[in-house]
């Protein structure tokens, strides 16, 4: 928690690939509110939900699967940084952890920001709210 800091305590707030890990929608809304409270200038980047390869697991379309399918894949395949997860409960927890968002979702959280797009081969890889 950043409660110990007064409103406007920072010249700028920088967040790179964090907001998708804090729990959607409530956690993401709370984080966006904290960013906006701490500074009028900020940079909030997150991977784009609509990019074909999920960046945390390096698996095509992983973000579109139901939790049970994500957990199954996590238990049976060594995906990116997590490897293979033997424990079913841990696999389900990890499957729920990342909640990617699209540009409209990010803009809804910080409506006064400009939403930029980082592209690779013409596809939007990540989205960035800048103010």
Residue ranges: model-predicted function:
Residues 98, 122-128:
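Short hydrophobic/aromatic beta-strand or adjacent loop that forms the aromatic wall/cage
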Residues 60, 79-93:
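Short, glycine-/aromatic-enriched active-site segment of Class I SAM-dependent methyltransferases
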Residues 1-51, 127-131:
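Conserved SAM-binding loop
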Residues 34, 41-73:
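Conserved class I S-adenosyl-L-methionine
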Residues 92-114:
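Short alpha-helix
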Residues 35, 107, 118-119:
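A general structural signal for short secondary-structure junctions and capping/turn motifs
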Residues 112-123:
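Conserved S-adenosyl-L-methionine
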């Amino acid at each position: 928690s950043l409660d110990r800091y007064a409103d406007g305590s920072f010249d700028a707030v920088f967040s790179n690939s964090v907001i998708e890990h804090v729990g959607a929608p409530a956690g993401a809304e709370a984080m966006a509110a904290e960013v906006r409270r701490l500074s009028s200038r900020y940079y909030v980047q997150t991977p784009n939900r609509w990019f074909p390869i999920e960046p945390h697991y390096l698996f095509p379309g992983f973000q579109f699967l139901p939790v049970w399918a994500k957990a199954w894949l996590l238990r049976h395949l060594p995906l990116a940084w997590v490897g293979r997860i033997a424990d079913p409960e841990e696999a389900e927890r990890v499957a729920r952890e990342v909640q990617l968002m699209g540009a409209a979702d990010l803009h809804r959280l910080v409506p006064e920001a400009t939403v930029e797009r980082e592209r690779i081969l013409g596809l939007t890889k990540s989205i960035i709210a800048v103010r």
